[in-house]
C-alpha cells in the first residue's frame, strides 16, 4: 500500500498526463489548502495571494521517496516580490523530466485581490504532454476570520481547464488556529479532488498541521520558524496509517516568528541608531539615504513594545533635524524610557538645540574632544533699507497689521515693535521649554541651568562632566563596552537593518490612515505644489478611513493656500482630518490647517500669523545710475504699473514708478478684504467668533504652547499623536502603526517632480 500511494504522486505514464500540473499535485508542497496559508506558494497556486507578499520571499520545496531525504521525483523553486511572483516545479519519471514555470501578477489589497499567471513548460514536454497555459485567481478576505479563494487554470486553447476553490476560517481572528478546506475539479472530466484540515500555531514559529484527503490519506506537518527562515515538513500516511512519503521546504524572506526565541530566549538587545545626516519628512526614491521622521518614530515604538529590546544606543554626531522634529523624537524616546528601558546617547559637538535632544538619555556620553554650547536662542535679521536707498531702489511696505512683518527688512533699518515683541515671546517659550526638560532629565535646578547658560556658555569635555551635563567622556566605538558596564550582563547591539518588521499575517484589508505632506511655501507649482496636493488630499480621502495632513509651511500665496484649505474642508465632510503642524505652519501654513477636525502642534512649532501683507519695489534712481532708459505705450490708465527696466542676466525686473495714492488705496482695500476673509474662515474652522480670532490675529506668530492656550491648536504633540487622534475619530485601534509603502509610480513622480 505504501509503495502504491507513493506512485500516485510520482509521475504517471504519459497517457495520464494533463497539459499543466493539476491542483492536487501543486498542493503537495503546501502544508494546508491555499487559502489557509498567507501567500499560496507565493502566487504559484493562486496568483492573487501575491498581495500578501511584503518583501523578497524565496522557497525551495521537494518530495522524497520512502526512507529518503534527498529530492526524488518532484521539487519546486519559488520567489516573489509584492504583487509579482515566479515559480517552477520540476517532475521526473520514466527516466525523463519536465519543468513547469509560472510568472504571476496580482492587483488589489488584503481584503480582495485578483491575479493572473502565465505558465509554460520545458524539458520533455511531448512525453509529459505539457503545454502553455494561464491561471486566473482571486481571493476574498472580508475579515480576519474568513478567507475564500478560487482559481481557474486553462490551456490557451481552452481544451483543458480546472477550477479550484478553497475556504479557511480563523475562529479567533489570528493565525493561532485555522480550519481549511479545498476542492478542485477538472472541467474536462478528470477526477475531482478535495481535502480538509487545520493549522495550530503553538508558539511564534512553531505550527502543526493536519490534512485529510479525498483518497482517505492524511498528512501531518510541522513548521519550524527561525525568523527570516522556515523549515517545513509534512509526512503522508496511506489509508492503513502507514508512512508513505514526505515533503520538505526551506523558506527565506520576511520575519515570521522565531521558534528558537521561544525555546531559548535571546540575549538582551540594544537597538543602535545612527542619526548622521538629515532627518526629513520624505526622501527620494533613489540615491537618498536620509532617515524619515515617521520611520524613526515607528522603529522606536517597535523597540518599546519588544521585550527583547532593553535599550537604544544613539549616535547623534552629525544629526541634522529642525527643532520640532528633534522634539518629536525626544518625546518618543521619553516614552521608550518610561517603560524601564535605557537610552544611551553619544554626542560630539552640540548647541543648545542638540543638547536639548540628547538630554533625554539615561546615560549621556560626550566625545573627549567634543564641546557643548549652551548659548541660548537668538533671532535677528539683516535690514536692507539703507543699501536699497544707496542703490536707488525704492521699497514700500503695505503693512496694515502690527505683527505681519515679512516685508519690513526691506522697508526699515531696525526691528519694529511688533516684530520685536513676537520674536522675543517665541525665544522665551523655546528657552523655557529647553530649560524645563533639560533640568528635569539632568536633575538640575532651573536656576543652575540659567547660570550655566549665562556664565559659562561653552563647555569643554571635562567642564561638561563636572557640571553634570554628561555622564562620561568616551568615543562612539566604546559604546558597546559602556552598555555592558551599565547592564552588567551580556547584550547584543543590532542595527535597524538587522531588526526587520515581522510580516503582517492578519487577514483582511486593514483600515488605513493616510499621511499627506504639505511642505514648503504655498505656491501652485513649486513649494507644496498646491495643484498636486489638492489631488493627493482627494485621493487620500477616497482611499483611507482618516487623513493626517502634515503641514510644514511658512505660507505664501493666497490662492494655493485657499485651494488646499478648501480641499481639506471638503475631505473633512467625508472623513476625519487631523492636522499635524511641523516646525512652521504660519500664515498660509495655518490657513491650510484651519479646517482640520483637530490641530496638533509641538510646543516649539511656529504657528498662527493670521494676516496679509505685500510690498512694492520700484526704481528710485538705479536705472539712471547705470545708464538705462525705458519707454512704452499703453492702453489703460494703470497698465504701466508693473513696467520698468529689465536686466535679464540677473533676473531683475524693476517697475519705473511707485503706486499713486488712488492705487495705494485700492491695494489697501484688497489687503484688508483678504485679511477679513482669512479671519472669518479661521473663525469658522475653529468654531470661534470673529472677534476672538481678531484678538489673536494681526499677523502674530505663536509657539505651539501658546497656540493651545489661545485656541488656535487643540493639542500638543507630534505626528504620532495626530495619527492616533485620527484613528480614534475613525474608530480604529490606536496601538499599532504600520507605515504604508509608497508605490513605485508615486516615487517616480516625486523624483521627476523634483528634477523639473
Say what each PLM segment does:
Residues 477-484, 721-727:
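A ligand-binding cleft/hinge motif common to bilobed small-molecule-binding domains
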Amino acid at each position: 500500500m505504501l509503495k502504491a500511494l507513493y506512485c500516485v504522486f510520482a509521475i504517471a505514464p504519459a497517457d495520464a498526463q494533463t497539459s499543466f500540473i493539476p491542483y492536487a499535485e501543486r498542493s503537495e508542497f503546501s502544508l494546508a489548502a491555499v487559502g489557509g496559508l498567507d501567500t499560496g506558494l507565493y502566487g504559484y497556486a493562486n496568483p492573487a495571494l501575491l498581495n500578501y507578499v511584503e518583501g523578497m520571499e524565496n522557497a525551495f520545496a521537494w518530495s522524497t521517496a520512502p526512507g529518503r531525504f534527498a529530492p526524488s521525483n518532484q521539487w519546486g523553486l519559488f520567489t516573489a516580490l509584492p504583487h509579482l511572483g515566479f515559480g517552477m516545479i520540476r517532475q521526473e519519471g520514466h527516466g525523463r523530466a519536465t519543468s513547469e514555470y509560472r510568472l504571476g501578477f496580482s492587483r488589489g489589497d488584503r481584503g480582495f485581490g485578483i491575479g493572473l499567471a502565465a505558465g509554460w513548460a520545458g524539458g520533455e514536454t511531448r512525453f509529459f504532454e505539457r503545454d502553455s497555459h494561464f491561471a486566473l485567481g482571486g481571493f476574498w478576505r472580508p475579515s480576519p476570520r474568513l478567507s475564500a479563494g478560487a482559481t481557474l487554470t486553462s490551456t490557451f486553447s481552452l481544451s483543458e481547464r480546472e477550477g479550484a476553490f478553497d475556504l479557511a476560517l480563523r475562529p479567533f481572528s489570528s493565525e493561532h488556529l485555522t480550519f481549511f478546506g479545498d476542492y478542485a475539479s477538472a472541467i474536462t472530466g478528470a477526477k475531482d479532488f478535495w481535502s480538509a484540515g487545520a493549522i495550530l500555531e503553538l508558539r511564534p514559529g512553531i505550527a502543526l498541521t493536519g490534512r485529510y484527503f479525498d483518497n482517505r490519506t492524511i498528512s501531518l506537518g510541522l513548521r519550524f520558524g527561525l525568523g527570516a527562515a522556515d523549515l517545513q515538513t509534512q509526512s503522508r500516511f496511506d489509508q492503513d496509517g502507514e508512512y508513505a512519503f514526505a515533503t520538505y521546504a526551506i523558506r527565506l524572506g520576511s520575519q515570521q516568528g522565531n521558534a528558537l526565541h521561544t525555546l531559548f530566549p535571546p540575549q538582551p538587545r540594544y537597538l543602535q541608531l545612527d542619526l548622521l545626516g538629515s532627518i526629513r519628512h520624505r526622501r527620494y526614491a533613489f540615491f537618498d539615504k536620509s532617515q524619515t521622521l515617521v520611520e524613526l518614530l515607528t522603529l522606536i515604538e517597535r523597540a518599546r513594545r519588544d521585550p527583547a529590546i532593553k535599550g537604544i544606543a544613539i549616535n547623534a554626531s552629525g544629526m541634522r533635524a529642525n527643532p520640532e522634529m528633534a522634539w518629536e523624537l525626544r518625546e518618543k524616546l521619553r516614552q521608550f524610557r518610561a517603560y524601564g528601558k535605557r537610552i544611551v546617547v553619544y554626542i560630539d559637538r552640540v548647541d543648545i538645540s542638540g543638547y536639548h535632544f540628547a538630554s533625554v538619555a539615561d546615560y549621556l556620553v560626550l566625545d573627549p574632544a567634543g564641546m557643548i554650547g549652551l548659548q541660548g536662542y537668538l533671532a535677528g535679521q539683516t535690514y536692507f533699507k539703507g543699501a536699497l536707498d544707496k542703490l536707488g531702489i525704492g521699497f514700500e511696505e503695505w503693512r496694515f497689521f502690527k505683527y505681519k512683518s515679512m516685508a519690513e527688512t526691506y522697508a526699515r533699518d531696525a526691528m519694529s515693535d511688533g516684530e520685536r515683541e513676537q520674536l522675543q515671546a517665541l525665544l522665551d517659550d523655546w528657552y523655557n521649554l529647553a530649560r524645563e526638560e533639560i533640568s528635569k532629565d539632568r536633575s538640575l535646578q532651573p536656576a543652575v541651568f540659567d547660570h550655566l547658560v549665562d556664565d559659562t556658555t561653552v563647555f569643554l569635555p571635562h567642564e561638561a562632566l563636572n557640571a553634570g551635563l554628561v555622564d562620561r567622556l568616551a568615543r562612539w566605538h566604546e559604546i558597546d563596552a559602556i552598555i555592558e558596564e551599565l547592564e552588567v550582563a551580556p547584550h547584543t547591539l543590532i542595527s535597524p537593518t538587522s531588526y526587520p518588521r515581522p510580516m503582517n499575517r492578519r487577514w483582511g484589508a486593514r483600515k488605513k490612515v493616510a499621511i499627506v505632506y504639505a511642505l514648503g511655501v504655498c505656491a501652485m507649482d513649486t513649494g507644496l505644489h498646491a495643484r498636486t496636493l489638492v489631488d493627493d488630499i482627494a485621493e487620500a480621502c477616497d482611499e483611507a478611513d482618516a487623513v493626517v495632513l502634515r503641514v510644514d509651511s511658512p505660507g505664501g500665496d493666497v490662492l494655493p493656500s485657499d485651494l488646499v484649505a478648501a480641499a481639506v474642508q471638503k475631505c473633512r465632510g467625508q472623513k476625519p482630518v487631523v492636522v499635524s503642524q511641523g516646525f512652521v505652519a504660519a500664515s498660509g501654513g495655518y490657513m491650510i490647517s484651519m479646517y482640520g477636525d483637530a490641530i496638533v502642534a509641538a510646543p516649539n512649532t511656529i504657528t498662527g500669523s493670521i494676516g496679509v501683507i505685500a510690498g512694492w519695489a520700484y526704481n528710485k534712481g538705479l536705472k539712471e545710475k547705470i545708464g538705462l532708459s525705458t519707454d512704452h505705450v499703453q492702453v489703460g490708465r494703470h497698465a504701466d504699473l508693473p513696467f520698468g527696466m529689465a536686466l535679464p542676466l540677473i533676473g531683475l525686473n524693476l517697475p519705473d514708478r511707485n503706486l499713486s495714492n488712488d492705487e495705494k488705496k485700492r491695494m489697501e482695500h484688497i489687503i484688508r478684504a483678504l485679511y477679513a476673509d482669512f479671519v472669518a474662515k479661521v473663525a469658522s474652522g475653529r468654531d470661534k467668533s470673529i472677534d476672538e480670532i481678531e484678538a489673536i490675529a494681526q499677523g502674530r506668530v505663536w509657539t505651539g504652547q501658546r497656540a493651545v492656550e489661545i485656541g488656535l491648536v487643540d493639542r500638543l504633540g507630534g505626528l504620532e499623536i495626530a495619527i492616533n487622534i485620527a484613528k480614534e475619530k475613525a474608530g480604529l485601534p490606536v496601538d499599532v502603526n504600520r507605515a504604508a509603502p509608497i508605490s513605485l509610480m508615486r516615487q517616480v513622480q516625486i523624483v521627476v517632480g523634483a528634477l523639473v
